[in-house]
Amino acid sequence: MGGKTKQAPRTKNNAKPSSSSRTAELLGSSTPIFVGFSAQTDGGGLVPFAPGFASAEQMPDSFDAAISPQTQIILRKLSKKDPMTKKKALQELHELIEQSDVEVLKNILPLWPKYYLNLASDPEHTVREQTQTVLQLLMAKCKKAMAPYLKLLVPVWLGSRFDTYAPAASIASQSFRDTFAGNANRSREVCMHCQVEILEYATRNLTFHTAATLSIGKSLTPEDAEQKYQRVIISSLKLLSFFMGQTAQTEELSQVKEGFGTLVAHQKFWSFAKHKVPAIKAAWFECIYHILQSVALLDVITPQKTQLTNLCFQFIDDADPVVAPHIWGCVLLLQSNYVDWFVPLNIRKTLLPKLSSLLQNGFNRNAQAICPNLLPFLSKVTQASLQDLDIYDFYQRFFDDMKLAVTKKFDPPLSKSDCIVIHNAYFECLRFLMQQINNNKQREQKEEEFSFSLLDNNVLEPIAWLLKSDSTHVKIFFQHSSALVAFWDRQINNRLDNGDLYAKLLNKFWIRIFELVTQDLSAEEVNEQLLGHVLLLVQDLHMANPSLESPSVKFVEGPNEKIEKSEPTTPVKKAQEAAAFIQKELKQLVIKLVRICLDKANKGSGSGTSSSRYIEQIRTLTKMFNDAAFYKSLTDDGDLASALNKFVSLLGQLSCQACESVVEIVFEILPLLETGKRFEYIENTLMKLPQHGVQNLLLHRLLSYPLCAEAAVRQMLSGPETCEMIARIAEEVVVDNDREKLNLLHKCFFQTDTGDILINAKTVDKILLSMCGPLEQPVVDDAVEVCGSFIAQIMPVICSNNNSSLHVRQHIFLKLFKFSLEHRPEDYLSEDTLWEITTCWQDGLSSKDIEIDDDMLKCCAGIVEELANSAELKADTLDGMAEAMAKFVICSTENIEDEYKRLERIDETLTALLETPLKTTDKVQQFENHCVLLEALHGSVTAGVPFENACLSRNEILPLLQRSTLNFSTIYKLVYQFPPPQDTNDPEDELTEDYCDPNADVLKKWNEPLIAELLQCIRVAGTAECWLEMSVLQSSTEELVLILSEKVQSFMGNSSDLVAIVKERLQQAAVQQSSVIDCRLLSYLRFCPQYAAFEESASILLHEDLSENLVTQGALKTYVIALQFLLPKLSQKAITLSSAIMGTEPPEIWVKAAVFHALLLNNFEGDVNEQTDRNIIVSAVQFMTSIGERQASQKDLLHYNVEIQRQPYESVINTVEFIKLLTEVLKRFPYELSIKNWDAIRIGLSSWVLSVSKSIAQYQDPKTSLFIVAVYELFAALIDFIRSEKQKSSTELLKNMIDEWDSLFAKEVNLVLFKSYYLLTHEVSVDPGFQACYEALLEQITPVIERLDYSFVYSFCKSNSNITLDHLCNFLFKQLYSVQHSVRLSAVHSLRQLTPHFVADDIELNEKQSESLDASTTICKWHFLNRFEDYLTRYDALITKYLEEFTFKLSELDDLEPIDRHNALSYLFLWDCIINACAKSPVALRAVYTNWLNDNKYEENFLHFLFRAMPVDILKNHGAKVHSNGVYKELTWSQQKDRHLPLERYACHLYTEVLRKLPAVVRRWWNATQSRQKNFIDNLTTNYVSSLICSEELKAIANRKEKHENMQVTVHSSTREVLAVYAIDEARMELVITLAPNYPLGAVKVECGKQIGGRASSRNVGMQLTIFLTHQNGTIYDGLTMWKNNLDKKFEGVEECYVCYTVIHQETCQLPKLTCKTCKKKFHGPCLYKWFTTSSKSTCPICRNVF
């Protein structure tokens, strides 16, 4: 493969030393790394750098023999350059240390320091981290064994604590703490023990090494080397700081002082103070800080004092947050340690500019680090330190600069924490300076003037500016200003004011504040911001705390005490001492402000908003002072009444919130009045106010404690005006759902000790009537829950002490009762609220607060009837209604002490609640008849009891079912007995005192009406189960049926005497044989305890008992019908010939026939038959033969050729069951039938179809419809048998039978059955009540219609004048639009069966017209597809709206309207028939059909609609095959018959079909579309459809069994190619057809290989075939066939057409037949017609003579 020359293989684990010459040279260097300080001279010089000096320890070449080879390998890998190798070696070393004992590890300990010193400063941070992990483990394991090597490790170990990579530093710190964790002094002891090594290590790094010397022998980039050097410098400086911190308390530091003396004397050490890397700079100043802190080391740094002072003050304005704290620490220590600290400095040039810049720039956003140092710094500034600068000039400049930091707007703004710390420092310094001046008793006048100037310039001036500013500093500045003023005030009170300085300052402050506030607020228009800031200032002054809360500074108040700087602590707030000025100056200021605001509020009466904003401020101000004197001062009159009137006068012009504030003020003033005047003012003034909002506020106050306890207030609340107010509020709550108003209404119902409430009964009635309004409104919202909960909460109150009128209480009860019945928890109604409402009226009944008389009971029953008769009810609603009705029955009667009267009242109540016109006996019977007919039509049961009418609409069934479910559920809840709790030994299961017996309220006695109601509901339940099995119901209706059925099953499983009574009544009713449903109800007995215990065997045991009892009693009909219902649940062979029923001879034929039918179903459904089963077959055939013989003598026995409606019901059922038995035997055992039986079947069928023909008009007659279905099904069974027999060899008997059928019976029977079906479904008006039965009748017949022989039908209609072909087509087209799916599918099937006959006629007509030049103009008017034209036009109008909303844009897909499934399926079924007609037609006729479609542009809407109907997910992902293409696969006929077939799936199937069978039609449409639509269709077809069609077509070509003479075809599926070879004699022609990726949308590629006749001929053939495959709706094989036929004709000598130059025409597939009389050349008719049209001449294309 090339590359480098293969070298000798590497030894495993690199066990051998490196052979590299460069590596050997480096490893061979013998210069040691750690020279120590032994070579250091007294002068402090170091060993000069010499060649070969390396910063890293030299790794050993050889190892001690005691070290294992594996360990040696690991150690060698530690010295490699590759970081990955070192990391793996460290991991291996870590594992080795974990697994080895201490004795083994002692061998490597002498080597470890050398490796550690090298690896701890490795450029790769993960290597450093892993190194520290190894050291941690090694120290933990070896402990004292490491002592000899400690001095070598500690300097680097401590330096690693400050590694810039946090994980490595953390591990090093943790390992050091863990190792020396014995006591608190261990770290100091270690530092002192290794002091020489630590200082030498740090000094060497700081003064000797460079980036180059630290990286000798390492292949590092300059950047990596520099980073390593910086890490070492930082760690060394921090190491020294740590060392000084640990050894600060040590007395003997001579060696340390010597080492530090050497270090600070070296000029390179001082260079780090100006290093560009902030971390190095910060570490250096930190180191200096620790030196200055140490008293012992102060002498070491003193010689460099000048240099150090200049450095520190040079960087006093450093902006770096890491560096600045250390610099300022050094500055403060310099000021503390050296009295002459200022001597080296030029204050004007060095200090002042930098300090000013720092202050003005907001401390360079580093305030938190610098500001705490300002006060200590300022305290050390004296007049002497300022040299020639006046100290007060310095102070003024200092505060002016700092004032900018306080008031200046910074961009971006300062952080909140920075603002706080700057303000703290500002006011600390101000207070300090003021206190200094105050403490100076010998002060001069200029000092006082300076203090006044500070107050003006640095406090009052910023306040004046901030009042009008939007600065973020407003609040914090006002707080500090207030604290400063409060401090002065307290100092005055404590008599610490020397020379009245503080008093003068305070006086000046208040004068200026009064000026500022009054001047600013006296303007006509006052800014909202200004108003807010004034209020904020006043609030801060009111709450001013004299103690300056600062965690860093403590101010002493005595003149002789010192200012200290303390460590930061958490501030603890003390009890606030109110400043004396609050009740003096501040109070006057507040009074002034309130009066100003009141005046402005009155002036702004025209503007409610303007007045309201002043009221907010007034309310805030009045909260500060609320004594009588304060309020009297607010008006010129100076009394409280004037103040009240002034505030009340504002109420009419304010907002709601402002009014609330005014009312609060008013009710603060009112208690200051005398009692009589107070209530008089409320009643005569306040209660007369017209504003609704104000009235609400007043009522809220009056209804609240303590006013509500006043007798005068109670009297006010009873007044008519107050009553109207409360009623209005109740009405408003219903509308706006206001919580405040609702709370006010709740207050009205506060009960006193006597049970009375605050309002009278009339007011209560009005509230209740208003609040119950939402409970009866159809529109549901939050008001329902609010009002319902409110009424439920106050109901106990209003029912006691006659707090409301009786008729209102009853009205409210009815509303609550109806609400509980009607509603379930919803979005607008919580479960808790519904529970409150329900328990409310229940408690009212139980406590006798509400009594149910006859009128009330009638009203309650009316409510139940109204709700039960409403729209479709949900299952949970019905259950809730039943629960409420049951509770109503119990609660309304539980207080009747006389048991007899109580039971009598329960019966009356139940009768009233359950009686309904929705569920009468006649309706239940009609429902039974309806469902019995449905089930009998299905064939699962015999309608053995006569009935004349089965009409019942679904709209009538649903109310009946709902009411039955409601009634049964109600009774169920009243009579169901829960099993007693089981005794267990578990103490947790013991019954407690609060145990509630669930059977306490269960009815123990039942009257006859209750039992009759139960039985009737059970009948409805059994009938409904039949309805569910036979019908397709909505999910809600299905759920209703299942709930009723489950309730009945649960009831029948209850162990109570009532169940025993019901069981006995059910058996009695069944024995009477008066109803089919009575027989069905016997199946409910299997849920009784005696059968239910056997679970799956319950049905078998029940059948055995029924068989014995019913046959013994002679109830044979009952037994047979019950057997039919139980049959699906019985095991195989549960019925045999030895069963009791088989020993009877019933007079009715149907009983015996039904028993044999059941025998066959029960014995022959298994996989294995026994020998005894043949006896059943023989017995059944014998029974059939006997009935046939009886028919011979009794002609009217089996109703041959009669009108069924006129026959007795019982006799018709006999015939129906006999026909069903014939059908079943014919399906199962046709070869057991004798010639007599076959004659009976054929003759009987031919006669019965005549009876059907005569009776079809009376299909609504139950027995007639049953007879029709039986005859049709017998025909289907016979045709299935005959068709299967024709496919195989058969006996002579059967051959003769089939031949006789075909010749004598088939035509007539087929035609009669078709005409009967035609009459049954053509323009029939069906009674709405019979619609379901009619649909069931068609469901049974339509599958039979598919078995008709449509050749008879087509021939009949072709020659008949009553039902012509036009009638037939229109009939089938209309059925495509039928609402019944089976009818539509039957129509599709019929059209498919008729299509070959229509096509055959069109072929004949086409051939006749092909001779004429006018063929194209005549044929299109008469072909088969022309019959579709009217219906295509109708459907186009229906689908247009769907096409308009979809223009192949992805953005449209989420907004598409759902497609009407019925219309869409009908339309697609119509096109399915059209596609089938084109597919069944030959190429020539197919061209005519498709031209007709194209001329009328029908395919455009159809194909567009197909895409509109496809799944949205596929349309969204049309550009990539995200989903499976299974949805586009062809549907079988059985799949298409599925009534639940999705429309999207059928649309995809049709798209594939039309592409497969009419590709040219789709291709032509696609080519004409717009580019967006074209790309969309192309992508979808390529991704989902093309692969399916290509694989099918190629597979079809490969699987062709017939072989063409002279042509051989080969398929290459992988490349989508078809290779065709035509060979005759020596000539050979080749053709390669390649399918496009988007085939059949894209044209195929035709390549001609060897051709007879040269290149021109080859090109001609290719073009002809390409044109055919592109423009004709044929398959690839059709094109190959045409190509082969053309060649055949050529070789046969047939002359080609001189227009298209082919022998066979591409569309008509005809030979050239039209001959020119002049030149004798032959032409195709369509070619010649096209020539005439395009040339506008009627001349021969060759000789130009008139044709």
From Swiss-Prot:
Q: PROSITE patterns per the record?
A: ZF_RING_2 (PS50089)
Taxon lineage = Eukaryota, Metazoa, Ecdysozoa, Arthropoda, Hexapoda
Name of the gene: Ltn1
Protein name as it appears in the record = E3 ubiquitin-protein ligase listerin
Subcellular location per UniProt equals: Cytoplasm, Cytosol
Molecular function in Gene Ontology: ribosomal large subunit binding; ubiquitin protein ligase activity; zinc ion binding
- State the similarity comment: Belongs to the LTN1 family.
Q: Which GO terms describe its biological process?
A: protein ubiquitination; rescue of stalled ribosome; ribosome-associated ubiquitin-dependent protein catabolic process
Enzymatic reactions: S-ubiquitinyl-[E2 ubiquitin-conjugating enzyme]-L-cysteine + [acceptor protein]-L-lysine = [E2 ubiquitin-conjugating enzyme]-L-cysteine + N(6)-ubiquitinyl-[acceptor protein]-L-lysine
Q: Please give the coiled-coil regions recorded for this protein.
A: none
